[in-house]
């Protein structure tokens, strides 16, 4: 992902305000609710029958944190996202059989959650920067698909 110096500063500053414990669960929970067909990949998570169940689900929160921790790692390697996410791409492709379109959906949900939590600090320019990054991460995660 190519970012300008200003975009990198903005990205770093805003991401420093993110709490992966909180936002990860919210982003994954919203994905599962807005795009309910994604729930089939999370059969082991227990009750996902309602918004209250999904958003309060400890496994959703824990996996959401894990997702954002991986995303944070990717932010440290913007020049090598495919390498950074190679093993996760392989896992999601070969073992989990996740439709790579879901990575784009989750990226867009994450941008929405960031906008909600960061408020006025999440300017249109910041949104543009994050959209570039989530698109790059989604592309990297889809890299191992045939």
Swiss-Prot record:
Domain of life: Eukaryota
Tissue note: Red blood cells.
Residues involved in heme b binding: 63, 92
Phosphoserine: modified positions: 44
GO biological process entries: hydrogen peroxide catabolic process
Domain Globin positions: 2-146
Protein keywords: Acetylation, Heme, Iron, Metal-binding, Oxygen transport, Phosphoprotein, S-nitrosylation, Transport
Assigned GO CC terms: blood microparticle; haptoglobin-hemoglobin complex; hemoglobin complex
Protein name: Hemoglobin subunit beta
Record lineage: Eukaryota, Metazoa, Chordata, Craniata, Vertebrata
